[in-house]
C-alpha cells in the first residue's frame, strides 16, 4: 500500500513528525514500512510560468522562442515541445535548478538564440511515466485552465513534488490498512491525535434512484449486498490537479474525473466502486448471478473472457456488463460521451472474486480488497462520498437515496471482554484502568466497563480482532512495546540437553546404523490400499479409523499412516527397480491413531521403529562372506537392540495378514505386546514386486515406559563358563523359540544363555521333522563348575525337552 504523506495530512495532524519519523513509529506499532521515497527533491528554482509569446525559432523548424513570465521577471526560453502555445501556464526550471538525474539548468544558446531556463514535462520533474495520464504524457506539462494557479509560485505546491510516499507492507490480517482512512486511524492511535473524517454534503435533485433501477441478486451466497447510486448530467473532463497528484503518488494513472473519483474513493475508504454509463446499460435492471458456461464478456482491457458457472457477473438482465469485483465490461464503460452514471458499491465474497482472478489472470486494486475483506459499514459511505465528488468535480446531479438488496448484517460488531487483571498478568505490567481507557480511545473503539473488565465493541473495520489475545496485542502495541519492563529470569537456569526419550531414540538409531542398516525418512501419508496394512498387533484395528486429509496432494498421500512398514516397502520397490538388490532400511517415525470416524479430537501419535530387509546381509568383519537375510538375521538384530537397552524381549509365533504364516512372531516385554517381526507373505511381496523380504515394527512408546536410563552394574565373572551343544529332532510345527525359552527355564540358574546356531530340514530327516541345534552356556558366579554338575543339568534338560515336545536328540 503506497501512502501519500501529504494526503494523510488531510485526516491527521502530522506537524510533529517527519515522514521518516512517522514510518519508524508505524513500523514499531506493527505495520512495517518498507521504505520512504520522495517524488522529487525540493527545488526553489522550479516555478509556475505564463507563456506571454510563442514564436518560431529563426533557424530551427522544431524550436519555438517563448517569453515566459515567472512573476518578478520574464525569461526568454527556447522550447522544442510540440504542445507549447501562448497563454499557457507551465512548469519552468530557472537557471540554477537541478532536475532529477542531476540535470543542471544553465543559460545557453540554442541555434544562436539565448535560452534562460527550461519548460518541463512531468517526467523531467521526476514523476514516473507509467503513472502519468496518457493525454499529458507527451510534451511539456500545461496546468489546467480552470485551476487557479499563481504565476511565480513554486511548482512543488501544485504538483505535490515534495510529497513523501510510504510503502506499507500490509499483512493479510489487516485489510483495514489498505485504505487511507484505515491508515489514518492507525496513525491517529500511534500519535494520539484526533482524526478528521471526510464530510459528505450533497444537494439532491427531486428524483429517486429506486425509481430508476431495480436490483435482483440471484447468487446471495456470493453477493450478500449490492447498492446502486445515480448521478445525471455529468461532464467528462480531467480530474482536479490535487486528485491526480494523490492518485499518481499512490501508483494509479489518472484517466478522467469519473473514473478517477471511483479510484480515489477506493483508496480513501478501501471500498471498490464501479461506474457504468447508464445510457449504455440498455436496461433498468441489475441482476447479479453466476456466469453461464460458454458465455462471453469483453472487459475494459478489450479482451474477450469466456465465463464459467464459478464466475460471478453483473448483468443488465440479459448480458454481462462486469466481472464482479474484478473488472467492468466494455459495453457499459464510461467514455467522453457519458452523461448519466450508475455507480456500484457492493460486497462480494472473497471466494467468488478469487476464483475469477485465478481464471482470468486479472488482479486489480479492487479485487485485492475484496479478496482480503472489506468493511460492510463503509459500503454506502463510500458510494455517497463518490456522489459528492461527482457533483462537485463533474457537475453531476445526484438522485436521492440508493437502490439496494441487502442480505448482510452491516451493523453488528464483535464484543471482546478484556479483564484488567488478565491484561497485567499476561503482559507482566501494572497498567491502570486509565491506561487501557486511553488506548481504547486512541483506537476509536467504543467500550463499556463492568468493574475492572472492559467490554470492547470492535468496529467492523477491524476484522482481525476477535478474541482477548487480539485486544491484548492492540493494548501493548499502542501503549508501546518499549514500556514492557525488563525482567531478569528467576530461579535456577538449567543447561540445555536431550530428554530421556531423545537419548533413547539416539541410542536406537546408533545401534541400527552400527548393525548395517540405513536410516530413511518417508512421508507420514499413505494411500487407501496401504493405510491398514502391516499394523502392529497392539493397535486395535476394529476401533481405529484412518485419518484422511481434506485436500490431499494426491491419492497416494491421502491418509495419515497407521504403520511405517508399507512406506519402507515402497522404498525397497523403488530401489530394486533400479537394480539395487541388497537393501537394509530402518526408520523412526510417528503413526497416527484415531478412535473416531469423524475426527473431533486430536489423534493419538505414537513413535515407532520399523525395518525392512532383503538380499544379502553383512555386518561382520570385512573378510567374512555376506549371508542371505533370513528370519534369524532380523531376530538377531532385534535381540541385539534390546540387549543393548538392557530389556528382556521374547518372541511368540503369531499369524498376521500380509505376513508368512510360519515365519512371523509378535514381540513382548513383560507379557506386553510391542510389535511384530517376520517374513513378508509372498503374495504381499508380489504386490510390491519384491523378492523374499523381512520386516519388523516396534511401538517405541511401550519401550520408553519399560526403559530405565540408569546403567546397571554386574560383576565381571570370576569363574570360567562351559558351553554344550545339543541338537533336537522336532516336529516342524514346534516353535524353536518356545523350546529355547523352555531350556532356559529348566536349566536355571546354571544355564546363563541359550542360543540357536543351526536349523536343518531336508535329506536324512523324516517328513514333518526339523533339526534345531542349541548352544547352552553354563556358569556359576561363586565357583568353577565340575563336569558332573554340567552333565547332570544337561541330561535333565534333554529328558524334560523330549518329554514336553516329543523330540529326541540328533545323533
From Swiss-Prot:
It catalyses: tRNA(Phe) + L-phenylalanine + ATP = L-phenylalanyl-tRNA(Phe) + AMP + diphosphate + H(+). Residues 411-486 form the B5 domain. Its cofactor is Mg(2+). The keyword Kinase does not apply. InterPro entries: aa-tRNA-synth_II/BPL/LPL, B3/B4_tRNA-bd, DNA-bd_dom_put_sf, Fdx_antiC-bd, Fdx_antiC-bd_sf, NA-bd_OB-fold, Phe-tRNA-ligase_IIc_bsu, Phe-tRNA-ligase_IIc_bsu_bact. It is found in: Cytoplasm. Its main location: cytoplasm. Binds 2 magnesium ions per tetramer. GO terms for biological process: phenylalanyl-tRNA aminoacylation. Mg(2+) binds at residues 464, 470, 473-474. Residues 717-810 form the FDX-ACB domain. Keywords: Aminoacyl-tRNA synthetase, ATP-binding, Cytoplasm, Ligase, Magnesium, Metal-binding, Nucleotide-binding, Protein biosynthesis, RNA-binding, tRNA-binding. It is an enzyme of class 6 (ligase). Its EC number is 6.1.1.20. GO terms for cellular component: phenylalanine-tRNA ligase complex. Belongs to the phenylalanyl-tRNA synthetase beta subunit family. Type 1 subfamily. Tetramer of two alpha and two beta subunits. This is Phenylalanine--tRNA ligase beta subunit. The lineage of its organism: Bacteria, Bacillati, Bacillota, Bacilli, Bacillales. The gene is pheT.
Amino acid at each position: 500500500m503506497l501512502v501519500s504523506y501529504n494526503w494523510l495530512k488531510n485526516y491527521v495532524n502530522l506537524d510533529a513528525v517527519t515522514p521518516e519519523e512517522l514510518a519508524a513509529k508505524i513500523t514499531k506499532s506493527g505495520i512495517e514500512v518498507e521504505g520512504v521515497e520522495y517524488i522529487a527533491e525540493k527545488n526553489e528554482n522550479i516555478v509556475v510560468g505564463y507563456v506571454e509569446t510563442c514564436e518560431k525559432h529563426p533557424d530551427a523548424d522544431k524550436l519555438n522562442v517563448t517569453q515566459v513570465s515567472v512573476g518578478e521577471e520574464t525569461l526568454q526560453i527556447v522550447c522544442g515541445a510540440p504542445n507549447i502555445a501562448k497563454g499557457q501556464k507551465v512548469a519552468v526550471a530557472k537557471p540554477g535548478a537541478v532536475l532529477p538525474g542531476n540535470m543542471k539548468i544553465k543559460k545557453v544558446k540554442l541555434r544562436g538564440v539565448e535560452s534562460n531556463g527550461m519548460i518541463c514535462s512531468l517526467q523531467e520533474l521526476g514523476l514516473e511515466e507509467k503513472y502519468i495520464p496518457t493525454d499529458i504524457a507527451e510534451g511539456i506539462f500545461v496546468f489546467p485552465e480552470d485551476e487557479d494557479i499563481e504565476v511565480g509560485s513554486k511548482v512543488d505546491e501544485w504538483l505535490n513534488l515534495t510529497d513523501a510516499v510510504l510503502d506499507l507492507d500490509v499483512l493479510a490480517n489487516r485489510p483495514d490498512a489498505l485504505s487511507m482512512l484505515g491508515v489514518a486511524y492507525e496513525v491517529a492511535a500511534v500519535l494520539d491525535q484526533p482524526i478528521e473524517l471526510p464530510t459528505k454534503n450533497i444537494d439532491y435533485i427531486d428524483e429517486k434512484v429506486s425509481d430508476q433501477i431495480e436490483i435482483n441478486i440471484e447468487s446471495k451466497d456470493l453477493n450478500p449486498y449490492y447498492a446502486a447510486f445515480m448521478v445525471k448530467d455529468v461532464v467528462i473532463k480531467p480530474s482536479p490537479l490535487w486528485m491526480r497528484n494523490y492518485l499518481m503518488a499512490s501508483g494509479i494513472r489518472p484517466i478522467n474525473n469519473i473514473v478517477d473519483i471511483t479510484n480515489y474513493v477506493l483508496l480513501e475508504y478501501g471500498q471498490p466502486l464501479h461506474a457504468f454509463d447508464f445510457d449504455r446499460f440498455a436496461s433498468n435492471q441489475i441482476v447479479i448471478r453466476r456466469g453461464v458456461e460458454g458465455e462471453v464478456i469483453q472487459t475494459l482491457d478489450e479482451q474477450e473472457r469466456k465465463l464459467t458457472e464459478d464466475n460471478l457477473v453483473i448483468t443488465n438482465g440479459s448480458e454481462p456488463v462486469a466481472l464482479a469485483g474484478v473488472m467492468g465490461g466494455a459495453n457499459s464503460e464510461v467514455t467522453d460521451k457519458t452523461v448519466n452514471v450508475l455507480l456500484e458499491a457492493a460486497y462480494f465474497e472473497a471466494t467468488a472474486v478469487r476464483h475469477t482472478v485465478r481464471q482470468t489472470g486479472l488482479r486489480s486494486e479492487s479485487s485485492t480488497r475484496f479478496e482480503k475483506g472489506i468493511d460492510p459499514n463503509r459500503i454506502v459511505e463510500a458510494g455517497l462520498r463518490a456522489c459528492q465528488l461527482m457533483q462537485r468535480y463533474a457537475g453531476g446531479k445526484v438522485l436521492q437515496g440508493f437502490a439496494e438488496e441487502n442480505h448482510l448484517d452491516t451493523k453488528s460488531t464483535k464484543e471482546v471482554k478484556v479483564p484488567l487483571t488478565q491484561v497485567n498478568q499476561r503482559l507482566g505490567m501494572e497498567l491502570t484502568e486509565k491506561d487501557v481507557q486511553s488506548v481504547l480511545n486512541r483506537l476509536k473503539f467504543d467500550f463499556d466497563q463492568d468493574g475492572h473488565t472492559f467490554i470492547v465493541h470492535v468496529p467492523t473495520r477491524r476484522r482481525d480482532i476477535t478474541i482477548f489475545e487480539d485486544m491484548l496485542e492492540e493494548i501493548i502495541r499502542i501503549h508501546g512495546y518499549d514500556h514492557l519492563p525488563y525482567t531478569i529470569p528467576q530461579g535456577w537456569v538449567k543447561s540445555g540437553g536431550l530428554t530421556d526419550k531423545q537419548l533413547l531414540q539416539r541410542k536406537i538409531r546408533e545401534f541400527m546404523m552400527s548393525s548395517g542398516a540405513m536410516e530413511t525418512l518417508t512421508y507420514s501419508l499413505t494411500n487407501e490400499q496401504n493405510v491398514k496394512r502391516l499394523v502392529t498387533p497392539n493397535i486395535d484395528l476394529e476401533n481405529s479409523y484412518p485419518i484422511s486429509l481434506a485436500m490431499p496432494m494426491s491419492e497416494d498421500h491421502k491418509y495419515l499412516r497407521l504403520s511405517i512398514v508399507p512406506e519402507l516397502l515402497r522404498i525397497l520397490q523403488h530401489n530394486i527397480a533400479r537394480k539395487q538388490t541388497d537393501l537394509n532400511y530402518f526408520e523412526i517415525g510417528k503413526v497416527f491413531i484415531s478412535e473416531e470416524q469423524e475426527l473431533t479430537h486430536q489423534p493419538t501419535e505414537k513413535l515407532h521403529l520399523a525395518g525392512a530387509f532383503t538380499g544379502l546381509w553383512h555386518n561382520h568383519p570385512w573378510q567374512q562372506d555376506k549371508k542371505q537375510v533370513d528370519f534369524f538375521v532380523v531376530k538377531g538384530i532385534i535381540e541385539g537392540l534390546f540387549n543393548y537397552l538392557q530389556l528382556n524381549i521374547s518372541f511368540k509365533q503369531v499369524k498376521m495378514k500380509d505376513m508368512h504364516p510360519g515365519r512371523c512372531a509378535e514381540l513382548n516385554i513383560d507379557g506386553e505386546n510391542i510389535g511384530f517381526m517376520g517374513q513378508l507373505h509372498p503374495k504381499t511381496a508380489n504386490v510390491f514386486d519384491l523378492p523374499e523380504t523381512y520386516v519388523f515394527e516396534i511401538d517405541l512408546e511401550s519401550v520408553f515406559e519399560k526403559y530405565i536410563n540408569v546403567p546397571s552394574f554386574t560383576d565381571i565373572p570370576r569363574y570360567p563358563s562351559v558351553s554344550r551343544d545339543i541338537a533336537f529332532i522336532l516336529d516342524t510345527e514346534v516353535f524353536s523359540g518356545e523350546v529355547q525359552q523352555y531350556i532356559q527355564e529348566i536349566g536355571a540358574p546354571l544355564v546363563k544363555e541359550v542360543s540357536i546356531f543351526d536349523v536343518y530340514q531336508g535329506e536324512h530327516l523324516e517328513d514333518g521333522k526339523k533339526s534345531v541345534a542349541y548352544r547352552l552356556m553354563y556358569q556359576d558366579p561363586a565357583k568353577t563348575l565340575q563336569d558332573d554338575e554340567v552333565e547332570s543339568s544337561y541330561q535333565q534338560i534333554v529328558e524334560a525337552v523330549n518329554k514336553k515336545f516329543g523330540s529326541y536328540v540328533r545323533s
